[in-house]
């Protein structure tokens, strides 16, 4: 155990590679970071290295337009927040704030109960 540099006998396959004893990088690969010697990606300072995509922060439509009451009879407005499958679209997709999302879902449910909005899509 004192001598780590032992000479090994040739393997049955005929090819022999010296082992470093550790779990380091393979012999043929260059050392360095995840990109090796290539350097940074060209382009902007985005997460993915230059993708030209800017996502606007979603704002609540009801807060911007100063709509206080969400009317259950306004089918055109409520229909914007209902998917084709009939599900209420979540606020992370629409950008509606929490208090307005609660009022919106109550108005959609009320409109469904009096048959102004369908519960599910008509296939």
From Swiss-Prot:
Keywords associated with the record: Ribonucleoprotein, Ribosomal protein, RNA-binding, rRNA-binding
Biased composition (Polar residues): 1-10
Region annotated Disordered, chain positions: 1-52
A Pfam family this chain is assigned to: Ribosomal_S18
Comp. bias (Gly residues): 20-34
One term under GO cellular component: cytosolic small ribosomal subunit
InterPro entries: Ribosomal_bS18, Ribosomal_bS18_sf
One Gene Ontology term from the biological process aspect of the record: translation
Ribosomal protein is among the record's keywords: yes
GO MF terms, alphabetically ordered: small ribosomal subunit rRNA binding; structural constituent of ribosome
Family: Belongs to the bacterial ribosomal protein bS18 family.
PANTHER family to which the protein is assigned, alphabetical: 30S RIBOSOMAL PROTEIN S18, SMALL RIBOSOMAL SUBUNIT PROTEIN BS18M
Complex formation: Part of the 30S ribosomal subunit. Forms a tight heterodimer with protein bS6.
HAMAP family named in the record: Ribosomal_bS18
Function: Binds as a heterodimer with protein bS6 to the central domain of the 16S rRNA, where it helps stabilize the platform of the 30S subunit.
Listed name of the protein: Small ribosomal subunit protein bS18
Organism: Koribacter versatilis (strain Ellin345)
Taxonomic path: Bacteria, Pseudomonadati, Acidobacteriota, Terriglobia, Terriglobales
Gene name in the database record: rpsR
